[in-house]
Amino acid sequence: MCSLFGLIDFKECLSTHTKNKILNTLARECQVRGTDATGIAYSFNGRLRIYKRPLPARKMKIHIPHGVNVVMGHTRMTTQGNAQINQNNHPFLGHADGSSYAPCQGL
């Protein structure tokens, strides 16, 4: 079992500090459904950024840079593959028609 979380701030109402606080709280709350790995994906300066580690959310500090307004996150409970091998953890980078994206696997 895993969990997804995210944040959208299109009107740019939230400070970067507040966004980071919200994301870390959401990740920790989602940890009950995935304790083996935690990751986020976001767009920054026109590039997709992925930050993930084989750690439970309570041990990982999520920090996004100023100007990021959309973030998708994932906490993982390992059912296949080894969570200690970080390439097995979400989000994954994918490509379609020359565009980069972080696909949702298994939906």
Per-range role (PLM):
Residues 1-106:
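N-terminal glutamine amidotransferase
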